[in-house]
From Swiss-Prot:
Full protein name: Holliday junction resolvase RecU
Key words of the record: Cytoplasm, DNA damage, DNA recombination, DNA repair, Endonuclease, Hydrolase, Magnesium, Metal-binding, Nuclease
GO MF, one example: nucleic acid binding
Gene: recU
Keyword Ubl conjugation: no
Location(s) in or outside the cell: Cytoplasm
Pfam families: RecU
Major location (coarse): cytoplasm
Organism: Levilactobacillus brevis (strain ATCC 367 / BCRC 12310 / CIP 105137 / JCM 1170 / LMG 11437 / NCIMB 947 / NCTC 947) (Lactobacillus brevis)
CDD domains recorded: RecU-like (cd22354)
Co-factor binding comment: Binds 1 Mg(2+) ion per subunit.
Task performed by this protein: Endonuclease that resolves Holliday junction intermediates in genetic recombination. Cleaves mobile four-strand junctions by introducing symmetrical nicks in paired strands. Promotes annealing of linear ssDNA with homologous dsDNA. Required for DNA repair, homologous recombination and chromosome segregation.
Length: 201
């Protein structure tokens, strides 16, 4: 099936790397083959099953253009478009607070490129924070195997500076200093709600 962006360009999903099912005891993240999105989805399932929070990945709105019906009981989508630009990846409720956040990965070791975000995502997070929502980015430095919660307000500072000709990335050292590191736990690949607790305290 071909899925296209509103500008007509074909969507190509990033290749997934398959990690070894075995990990050494010194590794912080045992499930190395999992993407950040998969890790978050697993964590959110744990949170919901245990009555801790209700957080879901937002569906991406798609407009179907062409469908084939090889059998009466089966339809095959052959062509579709992203109908609108997506906002952030996840939203939900925790301890009476609205959460809205995006998940990003980078293989850079010294900085996080701001090009990973889009203006409509920043605008959406600004609107949510204005209404009292808790917005942030969960950033994974893949090579370092480190994950951080980075507040939207801090992200806005770098985004606005970039718009004025400033640097086009956030230094790793800044994220490590101002963000909240999220170490993996036995049952939770990304126990980010502990970091949210720090924002709420």
């Amino acid at each position: 099936m071909t899925i296209r962006y509103p500008n007509g360009h074909a969507y190509r999903a990033p290749a997934k790397k398959i990690g070894s099912q075995f990990s050494s005891t010194n590794t912080n993240y045992g499930k190395r083959g999992m993407t950040l999105e998969e890790e978050l989805n697993e964590s959110n399932t744990y949170y919901e099953v245990n009555g801790v929070a209700v957080v879901h990945k937002k569906p991406t709105p798609i407009r179907i253009v062409k469908v084939d019906y090889p059998k009466r009981s089966a339809a095959v989508i052959k062509e579709a478009y992203f109908s609108t630009a997506s906002t952030t990846d996840y939203n939900g409720v925790y301890r009476g607070h609205y959460l809205d956040f995006d998940a990003k990965e980078t293989r850079n070791t010294t900085s996080f490129p701001l090009q990973n975000f889009h203006q409509h995502q920043i605008d959406h997070m600004r609107a949510c924070t204005t209404q009292g929502g808790i917005c942030f980015a969960i950033i994974k430095f893949v090579t370092r195997q480190e994950i951080y919660l980075y507040r939207a307000q801090d992200l806005f500072t770098f985004w606005d500076a970039q718009q004025q000709g400033g640097r086009k990335s956030i230094p790793y050292a800044t994220i490590a200093q101002d963000g909240i590191q999220i170490p993996a736990e036995l049952q939770l690949p990304v126990p980010y709600l502990k970091a949210v607790d720090q924002l709420l305290s």
